[in-house]
């Protein structure tokens, strides 16, 4: 069936880029319609379309790699570059929010009381739940590395256990952070402190959820024998993303939670 | 309500997904004596053995490596693109997605044009 004289992947025509683009259009327009006319229909439609697109697009990639053998070494190299570049773009995304935080906190204006934390703000104790969260994510970094070594050594059961543990730790972090958000004595509307705190930690939390989902997909694939000891790039990509999420938290913890209190 | 914590131990047999010990929280009927408790314990043990047999046999079936089957299916030279090669479910999901896409296009155009036109207040 293979008629190509090269190792690269000429993909089949696919409808998902179109449906994904329309989903983005519907979500953004839907957001504007929600803000002005209080209707969430368009935005919800966009979200459903986005979920359908993501499911089918990534399902197809798994088919192309695991079932059709298209992910040859040069193709895998390209996928690695792609993931690294994507994570780099995410680093720049977070850099912006750290810039905003340091801009406001290094030279607090008279309106804030000339101090940081601003007058009237009681920051969270960095040595309570935030420290536990740090331990949870660091531990999850260890368990995901354990999972990687288990996969490379063909230890199926250990790989499943360690990957499941990583996901559980991620969910534990999310639950703890949700509780912190609920119990916090300040809100997003509390001046620039609230804005920088909740936007930076909020986007981080979203990335934890995304990373946990990615790892969960890898767990399902590991259970279904998709990964071999030599070829498991999907898992490696998920592990890189997870380490990135961990490192962002460390910067958040040191800057906003600790120095910022 | 009387509650009793029973610790049941099972031997770990080969190729079975079992736990070496199971912690069970049991609600006891009021006024239950030792005889009733022993009978309940025996029932639980039987249930465990039955579920263990059922679980292990279905578990073995579920954990079978189906990758070679999938590989054969997706490498079949039938001219189908990868997003439809899995069968009927693929086609249904594709049609549903495309239907939402087309409808969404129309709806967004309507919504934005309607939002852009000034409305006269009665």
From Swiss-Prot, chain A:
* Keywords linked to the UniProt accession: Membrane, Mitochondrion, Mitochondrion inner membrane, Translocase, Transmembrane, Transmembrane helix
Per its UniProt record, what InterPro entries does this chain match?
A: Cyt_c/ubiquinol_Oxase_su3, Cyt_c_oxase_su3_dom, Cyt_c_oxidase-like_su3, Cyt_c_oxidase_su3-like_sf, Cyt_c_oxidase_su3_a-hlx
Transmembrane segment boundaries:
16-34, 41-66, 73-105, 129-152, 156-183, 191-223, 233-256
Gene Ontology MF terms in the entry? cytochrome-c oxidase activity
The record's annotation in PROSITE patterns points to: COX3 (PS50253)
* Presence of keyword Cell membrane: no
Q: Name the chemical reaction catalysed here.
A: 4 Fe(II)-[cytochrome c] + O2 + 8 H(+)(in) = 4 Fe(III)-[cytochrome c] + 2 H2O + 4 H(+)(out)
Q: List residues in topological domain: Mitochondrial matrix.
A: 1-15, 67-72, 153-155, 224-232
Which coarse location class applies to the principal site listed for this UniProt protein? mitochondrion
Which parts of the sequence lie on the Mitochondrial intermembrane side of the lipid bilayer?
35-40, 106-128, 184-190, 257-261
A GO BP annotation: mitochondrial electron transport, cytochrome c to oxygen
Protein's cellular compartments: Mitochondrion inner membrane
| Pfam families linked to this entry | COX3 (PF00510)
Per the record, the domain of life is Eukaryota
Is the keyword Transcription regulation assigned to this protein? no
UniProt membrane topology term? Multi-pass membrane protein
**Entry's EC annotation:** 7.1.1.9
What do we know about how this protein assembles, alone or with others? Component of the cytochrome c oxidase (complex IV, CIV), a multisubunit enzyme composed of 14 subunits. The complex is composed of a catalytic core of 3 subunits MT-CO1, MT-CO2 and MT-CO3, encoded in the mitochondrial DNA, and 11 supernumerary subunits COX4I, COX5A, COX5B, COX6A, COX6B, COX6C, COX7A, COX7B, COX7C, COX8 and NDUFA4, which are encoded in the nuclear genome.
Tell me which family the UniProt entry assigns to this protein: Belongs to the cytochrome c oxidase subunit 3 family.
Name the job this protein performs. Answer: Component of the cytochrome c oxidase, the last enzyme in the mitochondrial electron transport chain which drives oxidative phosphorylation. The respiratory chain contains 3 multisubunit complexes succinate dehydrogenase (complex II, CII), ubiquinol-cytochrome c oxidoreductase (cytochrome b-c1 complex, complex III, CIII) and cytochrome c oxidase (complex IV, CIV), that cooperate to transfer electrons derived from NADH and succinate to molecular oxygen, creating an electrochemical gradient over the inner membrane that drives transmembrane transport and the ATP synthase.
Q: What is this protein called?
A: Cytochrome c oxidase subunit 3
Protein species of origin:
Cyprinus carpio (Common carp)
- Could you tell me the gene encoding this protein? mt-co3
């Amino acid at each position: 069936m293979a008629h190509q004289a090269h190792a690269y992947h000429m993909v089949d025509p696919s409808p998902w880029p179109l449906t994904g683009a329309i989903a983005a259009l519907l979500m953004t327009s839907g957001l504007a319609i929600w803000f002005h006319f209080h209707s969430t229909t368009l935005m919800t439609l966009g979200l459903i379309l986005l979920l359908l697109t993501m499911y089918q697009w990534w399902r197809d990639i798994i088919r192309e790699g695991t079932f059709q053998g298209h992910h040859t070494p040069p193709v895998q190299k390209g996928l690695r570059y792609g993931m690294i570049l994507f994570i780099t773009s995410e680093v720049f995304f977070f850099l912006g929010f750290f810039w905003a935080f340091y801009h406001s906190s290094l030279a607090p204006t008279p309106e804030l009381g000339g101090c940081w934390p601003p007058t009237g703000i009681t920051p969270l104790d960095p040595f309570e739940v935030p420290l536990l969260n740090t331990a949870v994510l660091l531990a999850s970094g260890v368990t995901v590395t354990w999972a990687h070594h288990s996969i490379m050594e063909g230890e199926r059961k250990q790989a499943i256990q360690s990957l499941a543990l990583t996901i559980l730790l991620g969910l534990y972090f999310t639950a703890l952070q949700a509780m912190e958000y609920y119990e916090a004595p300040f809100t997003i509307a509390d001046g620039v402190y609230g804005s920088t705190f909740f936007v930076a930690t909020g986007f981080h939390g979203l990335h934890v959820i995304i990373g946990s989902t990615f790892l969960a997909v890898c767990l399902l694939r590991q259970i279904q024998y998709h990964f071999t000891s030599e070829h498991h790039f999907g898992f490696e990509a998920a592990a890189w993303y997870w380490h990135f999420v961990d490192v962002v938290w460390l910067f958040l913890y040191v800057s906003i939670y600790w120095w910022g209190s | 309500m009387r509650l009793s914590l029973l610790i049941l131990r099972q031997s770990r047999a080969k190729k079975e997904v079992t736990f070496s010990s199971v912690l069970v929280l049991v609600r006891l009927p009021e006024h239950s004596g030792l005889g009733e408790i022993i009978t309940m314990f025996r029932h639980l043990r039987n249930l465990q053995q039955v579920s263990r047999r059922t679980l292990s046999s279905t578990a073995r079936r579920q954990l079978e490596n189906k990758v070679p089957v999938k590989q054969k299916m997706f490498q079949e030279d039938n001219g189908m693109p990868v997003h439809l090669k899995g069968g009927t479910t693929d086609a249904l999901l594709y049609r549903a997605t495309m239907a939402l896409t087309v409808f969404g296009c129309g709806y967004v155009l309507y919504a934005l044009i309607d939002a852009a036109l000034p409305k006269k207040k009665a």
